[in-house]
Amino acid sequence: MNQFESSALRKLGLGLLIAGAGLGLTSQAGAAGHAAKSGTVQCLSECKPRLGIVSAFGAEADILLAQTKDKRDFRINGNRFTTGILRGNPVVIVLSGVSMINATMNTQQMLNHFRIERLIMSGIAGGVNPASHVGDVLVPERWSMPMEVYWNGDGSVPGPCGSAGDITCLGLKLATEGGKPRPDYKIPAPGGAGGAAGTVNSGLFMRDNFVMTAANSPQGEFRFDYEADPAMLAVARTLTPALGICGPKNPTLCVSTQPAIRVGGRGISGTAFMANPDYRTYVFDTLKAEAVDMETAAFAHVAYANHVPFIAFRSLSDLAGGNDFKDVGAFFGSGLAETNEASVTLAFLDAWKRSKHP
């Protein structure tokens, strides 16, 4: 064999290895490496209709997995997808990992490999509304990504395509309200006294997201919000689970206000972990956002693109930007947020089963 032939064979072998890695699936149950088909739905691993549950943190997923019966694990690109029965509902549960990219990747993997009738995001978040408290469980009606931005250097409304606010020649679209671009974030000026006089324009203007679906192809569409499923929201509004005030990991850490469940409003997600009270005030004043996390809006984008209804339950572990929050003693460590969130998710699954939705 000459050097050229040896090199060609190595490249061919590498190509086959990469192709195999892209298509391969390892299942602890042994059902791997083939595509199943049910009607028009293609499922690479299993085609039983299920609710798909995505969690970002292990503590959130573990509570749900502990109550899941008839569990069966599938390994997909190293991630564990667990099928089973949870509160009478056929489910598949995955730990997505933190971040917009991980949420996107693992939600799409779930939709590719299983027959998902509806999606549920289950997790914790930071509170944006100053009226919220640690341990509250929020169920927003819609989700958006305000950190998708056009960054204009001089702080003025961008207009690279001719008129102020027009960025369409770049394949982009500014987020608007009342026909006008939403205001950019004002950065506190060095040594400023606070208030509008103590800020400078950042030039960070919110953008709509571009999304392509089977229905809007080939032109696609721009969206700022992704709406949760009305039928799932209606069931969520009936829930009255008992929510704790002290964390199970440290019963001495208790919040001063009884946590509550609230359905409605807007949730937001972004690539940054928000620990900035000024930016929190900006997104509350501009968007009336209720909660912020790093996964749900990306998950919602994938759900919308695949025509799969969704809902998200987020329990507050802190007020984003946190040190000014009187309940900061309960921040993360007590386990209160994930326990309350799991209680609401489980109550929803009970109610969903009783509602006999398809």
Where are the language model's segments positioned?
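Bacterial N-terminal signal peptides that target proteins for export
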Residues: N2-G15
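Hydrophobic alpha-helical segments, especially transmembrane helices
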Residues: K11-L12, A29, S315
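Bacterial N-terminal signal peptides
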Residues: G13-G24
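Long, low-complexity, intrinsically disordered N-terminal extensions of eukaryotic proteins, enriched
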Residues: L14-L16, G30, P358
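Boundary at the C-terminal end of the N-terminal hydrophobic targeting segment
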Residues: T26-A32
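Glycine-rich phosphate- or other oxyanion-binding loops that anchor nucleotides, phosphorylated ligands
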Residues: G33-L51, R75-P358
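Mature N-terminal segment immediately following signal peptide/propeptide cleavage
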Residues: G52-G58, L64
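Short Gly/aromatic-enriched secondary-structure transition segments
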Residues: Q67-K71
